[in-house]
Swiss-Prot record:
Compositionally biased intervals (Low complexity): 58-69
Catalytic center residues: H316 (proton acceptor)
Record keywords, A-Z: Acyltransferase, Allosteric enzyme, Coiled coil, Decarboxylase, Lyase, Magnesium, Metal-binding, Multifunctional enzyme, Oxidoreductase, Thiamine pyrophosphate, Transferase, Tricarboxylic acid cycle
Description of how activity is regulated: Alpha-ketoglutarate dehydrogenase and decarboxylase activities are inhibited by unphosphorylated GarA, and allosterically activated by acetyl-CoA, the main substrate of the TCA cycle.
GO cellular component: cytosol; oxoglutarate dehydrogenase complex; peptidoglycan-based cell wall; plasma membrane; pyruvate dehydrogenase complex
Binding residues for 2-oxoglutarate: H581, S606, H1024
Pathway it works in: Carbohydrate metabolism; tricarboxylic acid cycle; succinate from 2-oxoglutarate (transferase route): step 1/2; Carbohydrate metabolism; tricarboxylic acid cycle; succinyl-CoA from 2-oxoglutarate (dehydrogenase route): step 1/1
The protein's name in its UniProt record: Multifunctional 2-oxoglutarate metabolism enzyme
Organism whose genome encodes this protein: Mycobacterium tuberculosis (strain ATCC 25618 / H37Rv)
Length: 1231
């Protein structure tokens, strides 16, 4: 008889077996059992087990023996102890002895325990309740759950997980189902345990193939949430199969669950063991018997679902039938309820709403076809709103849902899931089950990638995206997964290394966004796969060091040297910059291919997004040099240099230059064939949350203006990040358009390593502090899915850490250099002596002829035709005006093989209708660019030069940044940007401050960009007057740029040519005229272009020609620009020979030698004045007032200023006031 009082119940056999092993060899038993087994006393058995025996008589004898009469067995041998009725029945049943040849075996171990337990169960008076429960919702939601788990961390949820948890919840409502019967002092007693300990019947198969059953308990189930319950369930099952269950696992089971349905049993009445009040049985899921012969289509049409039979076998002494029936009804209701499934989905971090129970909708199939198509359209348009893209999931109770994406909204129910509908080519099919449609839609638009493309107007692009996105997910190969993991290892290990070795140093780490490294790697790899020439990266400071090390390939030793502050003074001219602003260049080699590609990272300042237009210009210049461009018909080499731009989320939404740069994307003068944008979306800007920093749903909404597809991706899913990166490159190559990837992640630390973000975002950083990084979560997913082993993951990380440690130790041993003051970069580039800028007369004539060499049938505008004729006349006869002098300079450079690029607002015609560099046919709109004719020699051979002139968008910041970048990408090009009025250049002040004036000193980045800034006081008001000379002079130092305000067309001509030919890569700032464009005196003769060069200091022509007498001069007026002509006119009017006007044509660097030589010619001068139109606090005086006395102390120590009074605005808003002020300047100058 079984030991009913044993705490192990039907598991007692296992305990006895372990005891025997322990007795023979204690080390063969898990140590956790030792304490229990030391004093364990097994129940005595009737006899030792015997090996099976077989009767050996012949077959005839077997039959005879079977027929022979047998002595009836004694009642004591056959009756089960306990119930008298059972014993009497047993006594009446004669059990014949084994026949000859039968196999006879004494039962032992598990088999013997079954005998005991089953005999003991006969003493429990039981009854059984049965309930059939619809299984469709259970099936459908389990599919949703496991599909999500398959794509993320791996693992599966079984039906028994769900049914067991529902059972536990039902017990909370019916605690009587958890109690058991016993006798206390001989009195019948019902015991209600404090906790629900659910026993799981676990079928085990031994090494010999024999099967056995154990019942192990999940303790205190009522305290668990679903995820905890699943973890405990899996732990019990795993330990049971590994033979590692402990005594505690067997004791104290209060209610059991058995699932014979796993082997196809539909309806089971299990036996109830003493010590429990109920055992719940689960049958197989089957269609009702009468429908099992029907086809799937017919079953779906009728709305027939599978059923699962639940049985509750209970101790009738303490549980009544009504309680048992209500208990099953509660489980039934739970399995169909919204609340139960909501909790399950939340606990498993399934971000979507569960399938909801509802009755079938009998609408016609035609109507539902339309509804299914509407559902498909809804997912394509709105699916991104339901995508699981936020790795933090700050609102864990919130499901990713949208009414437009729910099947119920479209009049569809779970009964439609297995019905077939017409889908009109969706995923390459005409008909599909709704379940398959939903599965594809969820995978395409609502997993870890959200796709926005409904704003794209081109149907071909939308169809291409649909075909690429709406496909079955293909998991990367194991080799690819290991490679992705290696990149994550590298990204995380690099940051951890720096954090450990350089505590407290700012580095703006990538922690929390490590997946951007495999993402960038994949994008570059795909560019290499397409056979492209180069990827140029522009990015802010966050993560920059990581990108330099793990993407560009900058040597670790160099990065660590910069952290040490150990710079070699022989290599460090200029101010330098912080390590997270520097650029680098490297070569990328494909891991799974044979191609390579150049990779470079351009330098940038801390001004967020300022590098964006610079990068675009740099790339366009490289493309123009390669001359692949859009003329490549097959598209493979077209735009073969790819800009890869990284952004922050707050900056992408907040900085206006982003929109300005995006606006360049499809413009002829600026197009680069598509930029790959990656937004490292930390979901915070310094300390500002998104709801305070943007008004749009996404930080990427601004990109919709150019029809760029937008991919939102979860940064905790590196495989998704890699897939999106490759898709982005493919789209860019196919359509030559921008693509935006919004990688949602988080910032592990504050804005910098010394910042504590929890002060302003406490809840967010409570979540972040406990968040496992992308590397760990991806490693766990790979191991959970069985793709790699833990050892493989650990070995890869150790290898990388060891590499960093070795380099770190090497850097510590490098030569140490003492800290020295930085040296100027001024002497790094010197103007060559004897540089000739004059040209032959024949070239002037050829340029003049070009303006009348109109194509056949071309009709110039009647107001432009006289301009063209006048230009030809000037080329031969002289009196060359400013506009033509400029075109002569540019045309001559084209003829000499230079690429000349001129852009700006209205620059093709010119703000003041002066340039007319591109002619438009009056009738057809055809365009003709005369200077492009200079790109061909007279014999028809190409010179190698080009004249590219573009009207820019109405932008300064991006436009100037682009032109600066162009000069970095093509140092030999002559690149000019013209402001509409010089006043508006301050819209590009960040570019001027951070790149143009200081790029060489900070980064060694050279540029020869030319800014043409119309300037002059002419009564047009404060915003059409000043290009802010004072600001450029304040920025000038170390020869960082040339600043000039020429006053003659010929000097402007020579200035441009000197700049293009001197080999110096430094910017040129030219303050150009407005009214002087048509001033009759502001002209130059042909000899001024063919015989001389640029002169930084000009005297009046009378003195230069030897007509005027310098000895009569007692006062010198130093001035610059168009004011000279007003002063000269007044001098002529007043006949003042005691006064001379000297022009400073170059404002910086100040031409000290030329100025001294000029002033030394006037021996009797007693007064020096600086005369300017600008207010006293503006123009050149704020610098010249300090610098001129220091430059020439013997002459200019007492120099005085004549100007407008100090003003906050550049000028008066009244033209009449302007005239009065201008007159006062002249009066004072000649007073």
């Amino acid at each position: 008889m079984a030991n009913i009082s044993s705490p192990f119940g039907q598991n007692e056999w296992l305990v006895e077996e372990m005891y025997r092993k322990f007795r023979d060899d204690p080390s063969s038993v898990d140590p956790s059992w030792h304490e229990f087994l030391v004093d364990y006393s097994p129940e005595p058995t009737s006899q030792p087990a015997a090996e099976p025996t077989r009767v050996t008589s012949p077959l005839v004898a077997e039959r005879a023996a079977a027929a022979a009469p047998q002595a009836p067995p004694k009642p004591a041998d056959t009756a089960a102890a306990g119930n008298g009725v059972v014993a009497a029945l047993a006594a009446k049943t004669a059990v014949p002895p084994p026949a000859e040849g039968d196999e006879v075996a004494v039962l032992r171990g598990a088999a013997a325990a079954v005998v005991k337990n089953m005999s003991a169960s006969l003493e429990v008076p039981t009854a059984t309740s049965v309930r059939a429960v619809p299984a469709k919702l259970l099936i459908d939601n389990r599919i949703v759950i496991n599909n999500q788990l398959k794509r993320t961390r791996g693992g599966k949820i079984s039906f028994t997980h769900l049914l067991g948890y529902a059972l536990v919840q039902a017990v909370k409502k019916f605690p009587n189902m958890n109690r058991h019967y016993t006798e206390v002092d001989g009195k019948p007693t019902a015991v209600t345990p404090a906790h629900t300990n659910l026993g799981l019947a676990i079928d085990l198969q031994g090494k010999d193939g024999k099967r056995s059953l154990v019942v192990a308990g999940i303790k205190r189930c009522e305290t668990m949430r679903f995820a905890q319950f699943v973890t405990a369930y899996e732990d019990i099952v795993r330990r049971a199969r590994d033979g590692k269950l402990t005594t505690e696992d067997f004791a104290g089971v209060t209610i059991s669950l058995t699932n014979p349905g796993t082997i196809g049993t539909v309806h089971s009445v299990p036996r109830l063991m003493p010590g429990q009040g109920a055992i719940i049985g689960v049958g197989a899921m089957e269609y009702p018997a009468e429908f099992q012969g029907a086809s799937e289509e017919r079953i779906a049409e009728l709305g027939i679902g599978k059923l699962i039979t639940l049985t509750s076998t209970y101790d009738h002494r303490i549980i009544q039938g009504a309680e048992s029936g209500d208990f099953l009804r509660t489980i039934h209701e739970l399995l169909l309820s919204d609340g139960f499934w909501d909790e399950v989905f939340r606990e498993l971090s399934i971000p979507y709403l569960p399938v909801r129970w509802s009755t079938d909708n009998p609408d016609s199939i035609v109507d539902k076809n339309a509804r299914v198509m509407n559902l498909i359209a809804a997912y394509r348009n709105r699916g991104h709103l339901m995508a699981d893209t936020d790795p933090l999931r700050l609102d864990k109770a919130r499901f990713r849902s949208h009414p437009d994406l729910e099947v119920l909204t479209h009049g569809l129910t779970l009964w439609d899931l297995d019905r077939v509908f017409k889908v009109d080519g969706f995923a390459g099919a005409q008909y599909k089950k709704l379940r398959d449609v939903l599965g594809l839609l969820r995978d395409a638009y609502c997993r870890h990638i959200g796709v926005e493309y409904a704003h794209i107007l081109d149907p071909e692009q939308k169809e291409w995206l649909e075909q690429r996105v709406e496909t079955k997910h293909v998991k990367p190969t194991v080799a690819q997964q290991k490679y992705i993991l290696s990149k994550l290892n590298a990204a995380e290990a690099f940051e951890t290394f720096l954090q450990t070795k350089y505590v407290g140093q700012k580095r703006f780490s990538l922690e929390g966004a490590e997946s951007v490294i495999p993402m960038m790697d994949a994008a570059i790899d795909q560019c290499a796969e397409h056979g492209l020439d180069e990827v140029v990266i522009g990015m802010p400071h966050r993560g920059r060091l990581n990108v330099l090390a793990n993407i560009v390939g900058k040597p670790y030793s160099q990065i660590f040297t910069e952290f040490e502050g150990n710079l070699n003074p022989s290599q460090a001219h200029g101010s330098g910059d912080v390590k997270y602003h520097l650029g680098a260049t490297g070569l990328y080699l494909q891991m799974f291919g044979d191609n390579d590609i150049q990779v470079s990272l351009t330098a940038n300042p801390s001004h967020l997004e300022a590098v964006d237009p610079v990068l675009e210009g740099l790339v366009r210049a490289k493309q123009d040099l390669l001359d692949h461009g859009s003329i490549d018909s097959d598209g493979q080499r077209a735009f073969s240099v790819v800009p890869l731009m990284l952004h922050g989320d707050a900056a992408f939404a907040g900085q206006g230059v982003v929109a300005e740069t995006l606006n360049l994307a499809n413009l002829p003068g600026y197009r680069v064939g598509g930029t790959i944008h990656i937004i490292v979306n930390n979901q915070i800007g310094f300390t500002t949350a998104p709801e305070y920093s943007r008004s749009s749903e996404y930080c990427t909404d601004v990109a919709k203006m150019i029809g760029a597809p937008i991919f939102h991706v979860n940064g905790d899913d590196p495989e998704a990040c890699v897939w999106v990166a490759r898709l982005a490159v493919d789209f860019r190559q196919r359509f030559k358009k921008d693509v935006v990837i919004d990688m949602l992640c988080y910032r592990r630390r504050g804005h910098n390593e010394g910042d504590d973000p929890s002060m302003t975002n406490p809840y967010v950083y409570d979540v972040v502090d406990t968040k496992r990084g992308a590397r760990k979560s991806y490693t766990e997913a790979l191991i959970g899915r069985g793709d790699i082993s833990m050892k493989e993951a650990e070995d890869a990380l150790r290898d990388y850490q060891g590499q960093l440690e070795r380099v770190f130790n090497e850097v510590r041993e490098l030569e140490k250099h003492g800290v020295q003051p930085s040296e100027s970069v001024e002497s790094d580039q010197m103007i060559p002596a004897g540089l000739a800028t004059a040209v032959d007369k024949s070239l002037l004539a050829r340029i003049g002829d070009a303006f009348l060499a109109l194509p056949n049938g071309f009709t110039a505008h009647p107001r432009v035709q006289p301009v063209l004729e006048k230009r030809r006349e000037m080329a031969y006869e002289g009196k060359i005006d400013w506009a033509f002098g400029e075109l002569l300079a540019l045309g001559s450079l084209v003829a000499e093989g230079k690429l000349v690029r001129l852009s700006g607002q209205d620059s093709r015609r010119g703000t003041f209708s002066q340039r007319h560099s591109v002619l438009i046919d009056r009738h057809t709109g055809e365009e003709f660019t005369p200077l492009q004719l200079l790109a061909t020699n007279s014999d028809g051979s190409p010179t190698g030069g080009k004249f590219l002139v573009y009207d820019s968008p109405l932008s300064e910041y991006a436009a100037v940044g682009f032109e600066y970048g162009y000069t970095v990408g093509n140092p030999d090009a002559v690149v000019l940007w013209e402001a509409q009025f010089g006043d508006f250049v301050n819209g590009a002040q960040s570019i001027i401050d951070e790149f143009i004036s200081s790029g060489e000193a900070k980064w060694g980045q050279l540029s020869n960009v030319v800014l043409l800034l119309p300037h002059g006081h002419e009564g047009q008001g404060p915003d059409h007057t000043s290009a802010r000379i004072e600001r450029f002079l304040q920025l000038w130092a170390e020869g960082s740029m040339t600043i000039a305000m020429p006053s003659t067309p010929s000097n402007y001509f020579h200035l441009l040519r000197r700049h293009a030919l001197d080999g110096i890569q430094r910017p040129l700032i030219v303050f150009t005229p407005k009214s002087m464009l048509r001033h009759k005196a502001a002209v130059s003769e042909i000899k001024d272009f063919t015989e001389i060069k640029f002169r930084s200091v000009l005297e009046e022509p009378t003195y230069e020609d030897g007509i005027g007498d310098r000895n009569k001069v007692s006062r010198i007026l130093l001035t610059s620009g168009k004011l000279y002509y007003e002063l000269a006119a007044r001098k002529a009017k007043d006949n003042r020979n005691d006064l001379a006007i000297v022009r400073l044509e170059q404002l910086a660097p100040l031409p000290r030698r030329r100025l001294r030589e000029t002033l030394d010619r006037y021996e009797n001068v007693k007064e020096f004045f600086w005369v300017q139109e600008e207010p006293a606090n503006q123009g050149a005086w704020p610098r010249f007032g300090l610098e001129l006395p220091e430059l020439l102390p013997d002459k200019l120590a007492g120099i005085k200023r004549i100007s407008r009074r100090a003003m906050s605005a550049p000028s008066s808003g009244s033209s009449k006031v302007h005239a009065v002020e201008q007159q006062e300047i002249l009066d004072e100058a000649f007073g």
